[in-house]
Amino acid sequence: ADGVVLGILLPSGCVDATRTRQLSELARPMSTTFHRAFDMSADLQNSLDDVSQAGADRLLTSGGEPDCLQGTDAIAKLVKSARGRIHIMAGGGINAGNVAQILQRTAVSEIHVGLATAVQSPMLVRNPRVSLGKAPGREYHRAQVLEESVRELKRAIAQPPANERGER
């Protein structure tokens, strides 16, 4: 493994900087990413400082919003505030339809995407009396990343978004 993802908040909504520092040090020489627990914190700017000072290499965030598109302004502020101390990675709701806009508005150099699609399991034998979770039937689906989804995302990243007049 090249890296570890972690994220610890105190009940107050502040970053648990002590434990984050301990875990970051234990993870070395691997890189550490503080995950989207950050988006649940009480104050994004203070939390950015805490995560950075605790030794994490990167911060995964949607800007404290349900997805990155809604959080572009906050993510852009975090990128400016980070001033190279820590990498800001945008993550949450990114897809081929919005990635170029998110990259342009935020100036992040790293993104996290979930391109998995639910596909039918090849399992031929099915037991309708047994469910392995609360939602029946999910055991007969699996998550799969389709090559075309990755190509589509790469094309969207390579092509700048159109401006208000439709010009690229």
Where are each of the predicted segments found?
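Short, basic/glycine-rich phosphate-binding loops at helix/coil junctions
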Residues: 1-5, 55, 129-132
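Hydrophobic faces of well-ordered beta-strands that scaffold small-molecule active sites
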Residues: 4-6, 32-36, 59-61, 86-92, ...
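Active-site-adjacent beta->alpha loops and helix N-cap segments on the catalytic face
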Residues: 8-28, 41-47, 65-81, 97-101, ...
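Alpha-helix-loop-beta-strand connector modules within alpha/beta enzyme cores
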Residues: 14-36, 72-95, 137-160
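Compact, aliphatic and Gly/Pro-tolerant "microcore" segments centered on a short helix or tight beta-hairpin
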Residues: 23-26, 30-32, 47-59
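Active-site pocket-lining/capping segments in soluble small-molecule metabolic enzymes
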Residues: 39, 89, 108-144, 149
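Short, low-complexity, charge-dense intrinsically disordered segments
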Residues: 163-168
